[in-house]
Design a protein with these regions (language model features):
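Sec-dependent bacterial lipoprotein signal peptides
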Residues: 1-19
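Bacterial Sec-dependent N-terminal signal peptides
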Residues: 15-41, 182, 215, 230, ...
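Membrane-proximal, proline-rich intrinsically disordered regions
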Residues: 21-70, 96, 288-289, 293
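Short, well-structured active-site flanking segments
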Residues: 28, 149-160, 226-233
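Conserved, well-structured interaction surfaces
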Residues: 39-61, 79-152, 165-202, 373, ...
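Elongated scaffold/linker segments in the mid-to-C-terminal portions of large proteins
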Residues: 42-44, 49, 53, 80-100, ...
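Short, surface-exposed recognition loops and adjoining beta-strand edges that mediate ligand/DNA contacts
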Residues: 63-76, 194-212, 223-322
Length: 387
């Protein structure tokens, strides 16, 4: 009798456990809205597009790793030794954000692919807004692949989301195939609203942004394919004060052999003219940096960061330019440009006269006076001589 009761109890427990496991495997979203919960509406499409745009900030701008990986190893970047021990010394493997470019780009591609799948199936939004939403997601995918191919060469192409049936393990596509896909995406992205259309959302990309990026893609293909052409750059021994002219002979970048430089330079020129005719430059150089001019004038597409926010802020400005505190000292400003960069400009060039912070207070005080830092270092003589 005891055995019968025990077996009955065991059977009941097994059935209950199986039911519980099925319930556990059924995912329920409590603290976020899943794509399936959005529904079919203008608002649903907007949220899917916004979710993809969010990746630009959270994976590239807010961490700061995007600019570090693409700029730290240039000839003119400078800063403290602790900041240039890996990427700035040509050794990105030791950098904390080494994977951000790869992961961020493919996260953006995944979200854009998912958005394209969901929006394509919607029927309760206008044809115009549907086309615009799909074109924006194509633009974001193209931007991500353009980052990938320039930094890694051959990379996998995911034409649709993994959750929609795309195989997770994709082989690396050739450089030429990646560029062909980028061009295809940007040609579709030209279907976005223009910046002057009533449906355009400020802060989003427009068809002008698609044209501008396509022109940049063409010129990158052309320049990478060049061979045997002399290229003169400014540089030289760091002990030499004035930058020296150095001549290099261009060699075709691996993977760019099939591109015709003349053809793609011509395509870049023609596409760039379409952009030039649509946008205007600001009258004054410093207007470029005015907060009130964001997303206006010559700003074709901007990352929409939130000042002071650790998740959605722009750490690049904090780390490179710095932020003035109430006492006049500066927070951040860890990285900057070498004196050689400054000397590339004529002395009265507005870009360095007004566009460079030449003096800022340090944290120290000597004999009751504030100690200042100067850039470039000889600017201290100008101040002392009241020039």
């Amino acid at each position: 009798m005891k055995k019968i009761i025990f077996k009955s109890f065991l059977l009941l427990w097994t059935v209950l456990l199986a039911c519980s496991c099925n319930d556990l495997l059924d995912e329920k979203a409590y603290d976020f809205v899943s794509p399936e919960q959005l529904g079919d509406s203008e608002s649903a499409a907007s949220q899917l597009v916004t979710g993809a745009y969010n990746t630009v900030i959270t994976s590239f701008i807010a961490p700061g790793s995007y600019l570090y990986l693409t700029n730290m190893d240039c000839d003119y970047a400078s800063g403290a030794s602790w900041a240039f021990g890996n990427v700035g010394a040509g050794n990105p493997q030791g950098f904390w954000g080494i994977d951000h470019m790869w992961q961020g780009s493919y996260t953006l591609i995944h979200r854009a692919n998912l958005g394209i799948s969901k929006i394509s199936a919607m029927s309760n939004l206008s044809q115009e807004s549907k086309q615009d939403a799909l074109a924006q997601l194509c633009f974001l995918k193209a931007w991500a692949y353009f980052n990938l191919v320039r930094n890694y060469g051959p990379v996998p192409i995911f034409r649709k989301s993994i959750s929609e049936g795309e195989a997770m393990s994709q082989p690396r596509a050739s450089v030429s195939d990646v560029y062909a896909h980028i061009i295809e995406l940007l040609e579709q992205a030209e279907g976005m609203y223009s910046k002057d259309d009533a449906g355009f959302v400020v802060g989003h990309a427009s068809n002008g942004a698609a044209k501008a990026l396509l022109a940049k893609v063409y010129v990158t293909m052309a320049s990478g394919a060049m061979s045997g052409v002399p290229i003169v750059v400014k540089g030289g021994d760091p002990n030499i004060f004035e930058p020296q002219s150095i001549t290099h002979i261009a060699k075709t970048v691996a993977g760019y052999e099939s591109f015709d430089p003349a053809k793609y330079y011509a395509l870049a020129r023609d596409k760039a003219w379409e952009v030039i005719n649509e946008y205007t430059l600001f009258d004054n150089y410093m207007d470029v940096w005015a907060i009130g001019n964001r997303n206006k004038g010559e700003h074709i597409w901007m990352a929409q960061a939130i000042s002071g926010d650790k998740d959605y802020g722009n750490t690049i400005c904090h780390d490179y330019v710095g932020i003035f505190k109430e006492d006049g000292t500066m927070e951040g400003n860890w990285y900057g440009m070498r004196d050689h960069w400054y000397l590339l400009f004529e002395e009265q060039d507005t870009r360095i006269v007004d566009g460079v912070i030449h003096r800022y207070a340090s944290d120290g005080i000597s004999n009751g006076k504030v100690i200042y830092n100067y850039y470039p270092r000889w600017y201290a003589d100008k101040v002392e001589n009241k020039e």
